[in-house]
């Protein structure tokens, strides 16, 4: 009963904002100036807008317009220049030298140079609470060789480094602004991207305005970008149809057929690099030992065997995902074929529960309030019940769920990870002891050893062997029960051109314009 009131409230507020926007646009047209605003609907409200501290997928969507990176990826996952124009490795693969783009400034007018890169990498590594520390662990020092040349020194070869620098660890913020506001930088971030931060209203909007001195300004065609979090996929779609949004991410799979039949809109689809899974508290806090799911791997195996992944994909995702049981899709060349997706087996699940001495185990599944998360949780709940599990669904606002996961205040957590171009980005931070995204609290020295070897090994065949070993060992403990790898589903006004679907699911604003 609460949800319909919420939906009407959101529509009403969007309608009021739309009316104001029309009035402003009319005024500008009279003055002979046509303002171009791009309005993007997000499935969640991002967490803190500081690349060092952030950890949400929707935050990365905002950062794509706000904070340039040293390098980026393209549609085929090739590493391409952004703030760095070229790079070269030393023969022993322990030094990376990067040449930087000249003439770049931050949004406060400060110069981007090698000293700024050194500051940012060190900030990522050393700032209290940094979520980038583990990503850059092998980088031991950074040297500014000259104004536009920077050297990253590593303790050992680090195969994922370029992929790491193509994401938040490679995002550059203004050293001056970060030093002036060390604790609340995320409330007013200063970067070097095509748009600068102007306003944020929690759960309502993030407003960015075009940065006049952007190095690639000829490729930017909007004066303003407004990100609006709209948790309910139905409302998100309604706002696209009414013209209050120009682009929406994570369209409900069930809405795709009707969108395809509407000539006003375009649909884009691409398989993600990440996964949807259920993270289980196996050691994050004392709460892990209070529930048989957390303390006994046999109960976790029984839970997994109660699930039909293909059924989940069909019922909850309308087929818009690939069933999976690892941090990578079965289509990925690094997928461990020695650990295939298990079939549902209710009889075996019940036998394991009996062996563990557990009758009708009960646990709470914390689930973000997103539409797809709720659908999947309900299907999981129904399937697990057939094996004797009593799953309680706890719907929690996304940023709040992350904070609770940090504290270990959960039994199981429905969490999607958007994925990275290198497998390490889906793996190390989730299973390395004391890593910031290790919400399960899983920690084993032999796993850490294999993780570190996979990072220092550059030969793909040898890395694949290490990933095979990791998959086999982690599968026995099941700190994460992987479910599937979804398709990113976008819908947007057909007048919007230049949209480039890339497997990381992020929207690049460069080249976007209304035709």
Describe each region flagged by the PLM.
Residues 41-91, 122, 190-191:
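N-terminal lobe/hinge region of extracytoplasmic solute-binding protein
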């Amino acid at each position: 009963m609460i949800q319909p009131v919420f939906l009407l409230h959101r529509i009403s507020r969007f309608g009021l904002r739309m009316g104001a926007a029309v009035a402003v646009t009319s005024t500008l047209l009279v003055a002979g100036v046509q303002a171009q605003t791009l309005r993007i609907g997000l499935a969640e409200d991002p967490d803190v807008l500081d690349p060092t501290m952030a950890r949400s997928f929707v935050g990365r969507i905002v950062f794509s317009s706000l904070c340039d990176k040293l390098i980026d990826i393209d549609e085929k996952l090739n590493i391409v220049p952004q703030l760095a124009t070229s790079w070269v490795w030393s023969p022993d693969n322990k030094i990376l030298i990067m040449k930087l783009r000249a003439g770049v400034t931050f949004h406060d007018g400060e110069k981007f140079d090698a000293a700024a890169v050194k500051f940012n990498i060190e900030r990522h590594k050393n700032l209290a609470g940094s979520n980038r520390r583990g990503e850059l662990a092998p980088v031991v020092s950074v040297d500014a060789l000259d104004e536009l040349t920077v050297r990253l020194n590593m303790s050992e070869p680090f195969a994922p480094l370029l992929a790491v620098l193509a994401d938040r660890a490679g995002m550059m913020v203004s050293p001056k602004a970060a030093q002036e506001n060390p604790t609340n930088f995320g409330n007013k971030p200063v970067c070097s991207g095509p748009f600068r931060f102007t306003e944020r209203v929690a759960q309502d909007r993030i407003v960015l305005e075009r940065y006049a001195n952007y190095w690639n300004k000829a490729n930017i065609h909007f004066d303003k970008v407004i990100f609006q979090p709209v948790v309910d996929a139905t409302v998100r779609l309604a706002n696209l149809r009414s013209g209050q949004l120009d682009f929406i991410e994570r369209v409900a799979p069930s809405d795709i057929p009707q969108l395809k039949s509407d000539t006003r809109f375009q649909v884009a689809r691409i398989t993600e690099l990440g996964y949807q899974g259920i993270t289980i508290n196996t050691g994050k806090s004392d709460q892990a030992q209070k529930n048989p799911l957390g303390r006994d791997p046999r109960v976790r195996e029984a839970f997994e065997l109660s699930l039909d992944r293909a059924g989940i994909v069909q019922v909850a995702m309308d087929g818009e995902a690939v069933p999976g049981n690892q941090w990578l899709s079965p289509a990925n060349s690094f997928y461990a074929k020695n650990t295939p997706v298990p079939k549902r087996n209710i009889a075996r699940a019940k036998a394991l529960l009996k062996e563990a001495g557990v009758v009708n185990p009960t646990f709470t599944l914390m689930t973000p309030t997103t539409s797809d998360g709720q659908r999947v949780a309900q299907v999981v709940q129904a399937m697990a019940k057939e094996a004797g599990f009593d799953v309680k669904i706890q719907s929690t606002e996304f940023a709040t769920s992350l904070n609770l996961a940090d504290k270990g205040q959960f039994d199981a957590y429905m969490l999607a990870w958007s994925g990275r171009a290198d497998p390490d980005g889906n793996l190390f931070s989730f299973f390395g002891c004391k890593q910031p995204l290790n919400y399960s609290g899983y920690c084993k020295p032999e796993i850490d050893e294999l993780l570190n070897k996979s990072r220092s090994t550059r030969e793909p065949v040898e890395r694949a062997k290490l990933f095979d070993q990791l998959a086999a060992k982690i599968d026995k403990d099941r700190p994460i029960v992987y479910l599937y790898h979804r398709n990113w589903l976008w819908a947007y006004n057909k007048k919007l051109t230049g949209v480039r679907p890339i497997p990381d699911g992020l929207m690049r604003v460069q080249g976007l314009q209304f035709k």
